[in-house]
Amino acid sequence: MYIQIQQKAEHHKMNKKKVDVVIPVYHPGSEFKKLMERLERQTYEVNRIFLMHTTDGQSLESMKERYKNVTVEEITPDEFDHAATRDKGIRQSDADIVICMTQDACPDNEYLVSELVQALEEANVAVAYARQLPRKESTLLEKIYETI
């Protein structure tokens, strides 16, 4: 598996597409920090991360200082809409591929972006997705729901 991934990584260097990430953010917790750290460690570099922050009294300015590729877009709670907020972030991007994520869905490994990009290289594929794994502390019901 490692050799196959390495070969695919070499292919990506030749035909590398620009990838941006859009994340709606509201009252970010510890999972959000973990998400940002894991996005930084992806084998396929993320060009820009658009944080669509619903104003909640917290500042995300430290994210712009910590991560050079972060843009914070402040929106009011009245402006927030699940689809429209993501669309607003997507429209700011000039990337070939935009990945929409949630603030509490952390990549399980460093290959998430690479695998999504690879799936989109197929001529007959227009959309790719990854599933969110339940956390270790999730209840049995949450674990069942998350794996459906």
Where are these regions (language model features)?
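Catalytic metal- and UDP-sugar-binding loop of GT-A-like glycosyltransferases, i.e.
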Residues: 75, 101-103
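Short beta-strand/loop segment that forms part of the nucleotide-sugar
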Residues: 46-56, 73-75
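Short, well-formed alpha-helical segments that are part of the catalytic scaffolds
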Residues: 28-41
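Short aromatic/hydrophobic "clamp" motif used to bind/position activated sugar donors
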Residues: 98
